[in-house]
Amino acid sequence: MSSKAWGGRFQQQPEDWVDEFNASIDFDQTLLDEDVQGSIAHATMLANQNIISQDDKDAIINGLKEIQQDFHNGKLAFKKSLEDIHLNIEHELIQRVGDAGGKLHTGRSRNDQVATDLHLYVKKEVLEIQDLIRSFQTSILKLAQSHVDTIMPGYTHLQRAQPISFAHHVMTYFWMLERDYSRFVDSMKRIDISPLGAAALSGTTHPIDRHETQQLLEFSSVYENSLDAVSDRDYIIETLHNISLTMIHLSRFAEEIIFWSTDEAKFITLSDAFSTGSSIMPQKKNPDMAELIRGKVGRATGHLMSMLVTLKGLPLAYNKDLQEDKEGLFDSVRTIKGSLRIFEGMLDTMTVNTDRLNETVHQDFSNATELADYLVAKDVPFRKAHEIVGKIVFECIQQGIYLLDVPLERYKELNSNIDQDVYDYLKPENCLSRRKSYGSTGQDAVRHQLKVAEKLLNND
């Protein structure tokens, strides 16, 4: 008798190196818990439909639970000749409970079996990712609440542009993550569907009840089309996309953390616990965790591209190409979960150097727009005001001074509308307090923003 579950019509066994190429057990053993969960539901339904006996069902379920326990205790050895987690479990089950184990696959194919495992896995992991995003958002909000009045330079083109609230800046990432969170939540409608019972592609002649297994596995609905059930990998692509976009947002934040921690900026100080040193330069303190998060976005987006290319030319229904849907998915899930945990810890333990930030906004021209707005308030056309301020900035650069250092006499030479009150107008803290528009960096607007964010988290 052939050692293969499908070996009946074959006269030759594959060589070991062919088995090595064909096998997926090295990575799809990740799905053992989901495979056992799906098989227990399937066996329960088979017994309830009088397709197998209650005794056989009990033997199957007890055997599956023993296999699961042995796996987690490191007592289970898998065989590559058995290809994947599904056939390894089935083989082990038959060894333990005899013919009853051979009845488990009644009315089921590996095609709907693996699809069920993947739906269960993705559902579980997406829910955990949502929790991790919420936890990270809570850390961002807590940091922002402590720095509403902390002023920093805002940037465009990596050039200092306008003074902004540190809280306003970091809250930008809160809202990016909120969009990420909502995408994961919305994707659950396309993840939480049961393919079990679709069999290979056309359903089964056995009197199974697909809605019973749907309920046992706590899926919201079942696929309406058996071909679609076994061939659909849209939910994996969608999950990989959502992971990739979240990682891109984390990468952008990580880049800012890296810049802020440089000797040139010194805006923040990272905890030693989230930094490393150099093997040759003893003075170094490197932001390696932030750099790793920035670097890992490449593998996440790469896995998305790989899955898109894998799926693009596949005819219905199942093809072996779909074995390639797992490694990238598993790695992307590990990557985003690890990145979110690390980033939260890094944010919770870093120090914001408020004195340095305050010093910085008093030694730049980020208040130049304020001077232009000041002139506009004095009935100077904006384009004329823009030109006047540009000339003043050029003179300041030539003299090594800033706008607050320019004598009133010189201001009046440039435009007689400028009075003593210009100096209060140009102070960075006043630049912020005048920002009254909804969603702006003004302290009142930021405090309102924080209340909206806090309410959102509390009502989730």
From Swiss-Prot:
Associated pathway: Amino-acid biosynthesis; L-arginine biosynthesis; L-arginine from L-ornithine and carbamoyl phosphate: step 3/3
Protein name in UniProt: Argininosuccinate lyase
The keyword rRNA-binding appears for this protein: no
First-level EC class: lyase
Organism: Staphylococcus haemolyticus (strain JCSC1435)
A Pfam family per the record: Lyase_1
Transmembrane feature ranges: none
Classification via PROSITE patterns: FUMARATE_LYASES (PS00163)
Gene name tied to this protein: argH
GO CC entries: cytosol
GO terms, biological process: arginine biosynthetic process via ornithine; L-arginine biosynthetic process
InterPro entries: Arg_succ_lyase_C, Argininosuccinate_lyase, Fumarase/histidase_N, Fumarate_lyase_CS, Fumarate_lyase_fam, Fumarate_lyase_N, L-Aspartase-like
